Structure formats: C-alpha cells, structure tokens
Amino acid sequence: MTMVNIINGPNLGRLGRREPDVYGSTTHEQLSALIERAAVEFGIKAVVRQSDSESQLLDWIHLAADAGEPVILNAGGLTHTSVALRDACAELSAPFIEVHISNVHAREEFRRHSYLSPLATGVITGLGVQGYLLALRYLAEIAGN
C-alpha cells in the first residue's frame, strides 16, 4: 500500500487562527482528519506532519527520500527562502507535490518565488485545503489505487 508523507512547515499549525481571510478557517487538526479520511477512501496510507523547525522538515524529507515515498509539501515561508529544503527535495525519487493554501502568485512579490517548484512533480496553489486532497488523489491514481 502506498504511503504518502504530508509535510507542513512553519505556521501551518496555526491554521484556522492565523489570517483566516487568507488561509481559511480549517484548523491543522481538521486538515489532518480530512487527509486521513481521504487516504482511506483512496486506498493509500498517509501520515500528516507539521513543524515550525526547518531541521525537522529536512529529517522528514530525508526519511521519505530513503524510503522512496511520495511527498506532499507545504513548506510555508521556507518555500521562498530555504536552499537546504530545496536540496533535500532534490533527493526525492518518488513524486513530490508542492501545495499552497493561498494563491502565492496573487500575494506579495517575495512569495512568488519558490525554490521547490522546479523540482516538484506538480504545484497546487490557491485552492485552499482542497489542494491537499487533489494532490493525494493524484498520488493514489498514479500508484494504481
């Protein structure tokens, strides 16, 4: 059974409280439950993780790379700043989907650059928390589930 790693970066643990006009009212706990229910429906396993620590995100990406497992990554603000995160993602051999809840291209200029997008299999931005479910469905379909 396919295992998908959903990795959320800085400030995403504050979903539902931080800028709900931008990120919506769904909390991280609710998002995790949505993803876990969808994974069961799609016939795959999913583990949802969140950390404000770049070091922890790197560790999780390295584990996924070593296991050959797909990743759905919302690196938050590290998307625009972290070469280390980019280098870790370069080690991923399985599909990697970059997800952003808000449309980063309709926001501040500094949010429009991603160190991760050139490496990603695909990028989903601006579709709210549904972006995670779309990414999960895609990964399930290409895995044959």
Swiss-Prot record:
EC class of the enzyme, as a word: lyase
Residues that coordinate or bind substrate: 74, 80, 87, 101-102, 111
Reaction equations catalysed: 3-dehydroquinate = 3-dehydroshikimate + H2O
Subunit (UniProt): Homododecamer.
Protein's UniProt name: 3-dehydroquinate dehydratase
Pfam families cross-referenced by the UniProt entry: DHquinase_II
The family this protein is said to belong to: Belongs to the type-II 3-dehydroquinase family.
Domain of life assignment: Bacteria
Biological-process GO terms, alphabetical: amino acid biosynthetic process; aromatic amino acid family biosynthetic process; chorismate biosynthetic process; quinate catabolic process
GO MF: 3-dehydroquinate dehydratase activity
Site (Transition state stabilizer): 18
Active-site feature positions: 23 (proton acceptor), 100 (proton donor)
InterPro entries in alphabetical order: DHquinase_II, DHquinase_II_CS, DHquinase_II_sf
Provenance organism: Mycobacterium leprae (strain TN)
EC number(s) per entry: 4.2.1.10
Pathway info: Metabolic intermediate biosynthesis; chorismate biosynthesis; chorismate from D-erythrose 4-phosphate and phosphoenolpyruvate: step 3/7
